[in-house]
């Protein structure tokens, strides 16, 4: 069981990447117990993904944070914890990294405040983009109040929304 904890999925590999080159790139983060590049059974050609297993789970986490999105053999790779598959990836990991955490926090109040008071009401495109823009569940958590407010105000007049917007923008 312990060996599975330090196991990383590495996707987006070049077909030229082999176990040796993958180990070389990841070995600077710690002791590696196993490297596998998954190959097609018939052609023996790389299928573009593999696994790197570290002896130590902390080394694996360091490698995952450092190498995700980096270029190996000319291809940008995706590194994730193996076995936690898409469920974990879409919620926590991609949600946190897609928008960049710093931009996320700093930009939320000011950026959303201005767009709420400005063109956001004029055309609904922004609202939908922000919901499906790869920011994960946390964005919905913050904007759920304004989301439902936005939809109900459209049909019932915007008095609450207008006062809220002017408060939000003047408050900065």
From Swiss-Prot:
Expression sites (tissue/organ): Ubiquitous.
Biased composition (Low complexity): 138-172
SUPFAM superfamilies documented for this protein: RNA-binding domain, RBD
Annotated ranges, domain RRM: 6-84
Changes after translation: Methylated on arginine residues. Methylation of the RGG motifs is a prerequisite for recruitment into SGs.
Keywords noted in UniProt: Activator, Cytoplasm, Nucleus, Phosphoprotein, Repressor, RNA-binding, Stress response
Compositional bias annotation for Gly residues: 93-106, 114-125
Compartments in which it is found: Nucleus, Nucleoplasm; Cytoplasm
Chain spans, region Disordered: 69-172
Induction comment from the UniProt entry of this chain: By cold stress in response to DNA damage induced by UV irradiation or UV mimetic agents. Up-regulated by hypoxia.
UniProt keyword annotation of Phosphoprotein present: yes
Residues with the Phosphoserine modification: 130, 138, 146, 156, 159, 163
GO molecular function terms listed in the Swiss-Prot or TrEMBL record: mRNA 3'-UTR binding; RNA binding; small ribosomal subunit rRNA binding; translation repressor activity
Summary of subunit composition and partner proteins: Interacts with EIF4G1. Associates with ribosomes.
Swiss-Prot/TrEMBL domain comment: Both the RRM domain and the arginine, glycine (RGG) rich domain are necessary for binding to the TXN 3'-untranslated region. Both the RRM domain and the arginine, glycine (RGG) rich domain (RGG repeats) are necessary for optimal recruitment into SGs upon cellular stress. The C-terminal domain containing RGG repeats is necessary for translational repression.
PANTHER family referenced in this protein's UniProt entry, alphabetically: TRANSFORMER-2 SEX-DETERMINING PROTEIN-RELATED
Protein function: Cold-inducible mRNA binding protein that plays a protective role in the genotoxic stress response by stabilizing transcripts of genes involved in cell survival. Acts as a translational activator. Seems to play an essential role in cold-induced suppression of cell proliferation. Binds specifically to the 3'-untranslated regions (3'-UTRs) of stress-responsive transcripts RPA2 and TXN. Acts as a translational repressor. Promotes assembly of stress granules (SGs), when overexpressed.
Protein's name in the database: Cold-inducible RNA-binding protein
Species for this entry: Homo sapiens
């Amino acid at each position: 069981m312990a060996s599975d904890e330090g196991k990383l999925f590495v996707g987006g590999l070049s077909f030229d990447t082999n176990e040796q080159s993958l180990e070389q790139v990841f070995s600077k983060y710690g002791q590696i117990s196993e490297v596998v590049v998954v190959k097609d059974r018939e052609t023996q050609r790389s299928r573009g993904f593999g696994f790197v297993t570290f002896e130590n789970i902390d080394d694996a986490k360091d490698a995952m944070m450092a190498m995700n999105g980096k270029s190996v053999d000319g291809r940008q790779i995706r590194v994730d914890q193996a076995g936690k598959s898409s469920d974990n990836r879409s919620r926590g990991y991609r949600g946190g990294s897609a928008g960049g955490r710093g931009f996320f926090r700093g930009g939320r109040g000011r950026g959303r405040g201005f767009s709420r008071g400005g063109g956001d009401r004029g055309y609904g495109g922004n609202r939908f983009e922000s919901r499906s823009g790869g920011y994960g569940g946390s964005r919905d958590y913050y904007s759920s109040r304004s989301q439902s407010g936005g939809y109900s105000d459209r049909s019932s007049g915007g008095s609450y929304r207008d006062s809220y917007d002017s408060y939000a923008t003047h408050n900065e």
